[in-house]
């Protein structure tokens, strides 16, 4: 029930599933496998898959191995790839233009890192009028406990909890497990 007019379509938004972003991420292999499963499902159902790739000189320098999308995933040449430099995938990128061109008003979000780019992108989408479903077992983050953060499994669980109950007028949020994702409507 997006607030965006004439935007009836859904897209799978794959955020920052890059070597450097998931190298030490919680439950990395399972999460990447779940993302791959959803990419395959979206392609079979002719749902747009939109890739987002973070670039910064400190952690993910453009062109480096750390910057590359993980080898288990391969964007199709016809699938949009949006390069970003900030946590919110919409900030100073062409993502809004890409989604508008595809008639997308609902996003199914997967990727990394939960407590950074996933949260920022979810909120960025929601305030821009998108419906946003977070796939609860297809996002991950690294361990930042040495800086006072909760363990990664708790960060993920907390994000799933609060996104399940996120509300705003005219928009739908929520979570779904990989096996329960329905690209045809709210999960």
Residue ranges of model-derived segments:
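Active-site-adjacent betaalpha module
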Residues: 1-11, 37-45, 60-187
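Short acidic, Gly/Ser-rich segments with clustered Asp/Glu that frequently serve as metal-coordination loops
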Residues: 18-23
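Short, well-ordered beta-to-alpha junction loops that form the rim of enzyme active sites
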Residues: 54-55, 112
